[in-house]
Amino acid sequence: MPVLPDRQVINQLISGHYGDPFSILGMHETSQGLQVCALLPDAQEVWLVETENGRRIAQLTLEDPRGFFIAQLTRRKKSFRYQFAVTWQENPQIIDDPYRFGPLLQDIDSWLLAEGTHLRPYERLGAHLMRLDGVPGVSFAVWAPNAQRVSVVGDFNFWDGRRHPMRLRRENGIWELFLPGIEAGQLYKFEIIDCHGQVRLKADPYAFEAQMRPETASLISPLPDVVKSSAARQKANDLCSPVSIYEVHLGSWRRHTDNNFWLSYRELADQLVEYVKYMGFTHVELLPINEHPFDGSWGYQPLGLYAPTRRYGTPEDFKAFVAKFHQAGINVILDWVPGHFPSDEHGLSTFDGTALYEYADPREGYHQDWNTLIYNYGRNEVRNYLAGNAFYWMERFGIDALRIDAVASMIYRDYSRAEGQWVPNYYGGRENLEAIAFLRYTNKTIGVERPGSVTMAEESTDFPGVTLPPDIGGLGFNYKWNMGWMHDTLNYMQCDPVHRKYHHNLMTFGMLYAYTENFILPLSHDEVVHGKRSILDRMPGDAWQKFANLRAYYAFMWAHPGKKLLFMGCEFAQGREWNFETSLDWHLLDDENGWHSGVQRLVRDLNHCYRQYAPLYEWDYQPAGFEWLVVDDHENSVFAFLRRDAEGHELIAISNFTPVPRYHYRVGIPQGGHYREVLNSDSAFYCGSNLGNQGGIDSHHVRSHNHEHSLLLTLPPLATIYLLREN
């Protein structure tokens, strides 16, 4: 007779409340020989089969009608490889027992995961297709240290949490199990009995693929292969290279005209890549494509950080989409959100019954602006989950850069909080020291492990050293969005031209701090939503003046120090605000001679001009690359400045922000010579009035603006011109 486990243990195991299934299930060496136990609800008959020869060794006895089987092999003392021959409702099946396999995580992995320094936690946690002891299947692992029991549930076991409880690795709180015979494409979740005894059904935080909303299950999917970077892609991210970014929301750039449905990743690869290349942008920036439950969040409330959203296709489709951009010589930036996550029940919130991924105190862990939860950056495992995710997108999909969203909300404990609604740090300050340490670690890791890949911060305050290296006290980002420049210049452009002279400093103030960080000048999605109106609609005047103002502003921006970013639709002056539920208004370009087509041609030429002339980008972050020529002509609302590259080539940008043409306008210049007009935003080609300097002009030896040489120019109304000094 077999020695039965304690009846209470059997009851707990069958009811799904026993936390150590490997101590009962599987094959165990006892003083009376080998004992084999199995929990197979609904099985009618179970035989033990020796894998090596296929011989049936013994029939297991049904000790509990709820599916608990046991066999005692008194003549066998040493464990051996085995299978079960199971009869289900008269259907025979040979299965491998998940409980015959040993621990999965290696000691080094356990140590690194607990320490929070595992470079690739996604290689160990989550669901992984593999062969173990020659048996194909999937290894599952999930961090839930306070859970009483965790099971894998899915299509393969009727979503029954009793059937496949997992092994707890007590040294790190990770539950693991290898399930033989499971294949890619099957649905799964983790059924967790939390520390309070409540049952929770959770999606896999490390899932590589997830169901399309509103469904919430994870999909078993292979870990994507490594994508190597290239010298060309690395150079394209450099501070001395031209960086012109086209920001895109994949779900609304263009849609199917017959049903308003999204384009797939592969359809976008065919259409978007060609368009971005035609327009001359060097980079494309994608609003978050991590899996997210709510369309209206635009992806900024992600739950599946490791899964490209199923809205547009599979991970393989997304990988092909990125590769298509790389083939076209365009780098890909991904908006990344490590600052907060939604509180959906199937997600990370109270994962094991405790505030595991989030701060427990709502003054730290709840984001009242967005009704989301804030990651607990003080936990090693949470930092590892996030930092590993950043590296994952770069290593496994070839993402060239990450733009980190809402950095200010991460690094300040009092962000958008009134007095008494936040918790000071250890020193009594307002900085979130844990978040700062996390950002420094992540940026430094990317710099070391993925050379040439960069990070960009959307940071809206004056926090010092955002783009300084962590070793000297900085956050370690490569670039920072210049929100101040964007707000100031847009406020200026919204003024009626007659009043602009009173706000002249709004256009010049940015140069006072332009070299404190490595800035990107952003006209992003945030500026064309929530009643702010489109960029075009903010411009004053009648239709002609609105378009002229916009063209002049874009040309001013492209000449100004700092890399460029433009949200989709702005490149052809879409008149309405962005709507994530519909396509851009491409019909505005039907008239090739219309104003919208003119703006599109201008942006295309600005990009090509920007990439062609090194003075416009090479010394973006060197004071020697910029010089004001006319900075104080507020009466005429004229600005003139010079851009210079490392070899001494010079390009002059002059803007007239009034509708009054300025004839015989003299501008002092450092060097005399012939200056060719390489761009004029008032050109008839862009639907302007076609006033200019007839292609070029020679300087005069006439002193002006503290220079010995000068140019006598015609400044078109509401326009910006570029003049290139020819050797």
UniProtKB/Swiss-Prot annotation:
The keyword Transferase applies. Disulfide bonds: none annotated. GO terms for biological process: glycogen biosynthetic process. The active site is at 405 (nucleophile), 458 (proton donor). It catalyses: Transfers a segment of a (1->4)-alpha-D-glucan chain to a primary hydroxy group in a similar glucan chain. It holds the Pfam family GlgB_N. Keywords: Carbohydrate metabolism, Glycogen biosynthesis, Glycogen metabolism, Glycosyltransferase, Transferase. SMART domains: Aamy. One of its GO terms (cellular component) is cytosol. InterPro entries: A-amylase/branching_C, Branching_enzy, GlgB, GlgB_N, GlgB_N_E_set_prok, Glyco_hydro_13_cat_dom, Glyco_hydro_13_N, Glyco_hydro_b. Belongs to the glycosyl hydrolase 13 family. GlgB subfamily. NCBIfam families: branching_enzym, PRK05402.1, PRK12313.1. Monomer. This is 1,4-alpha-glucan branching enzyme GlgB.
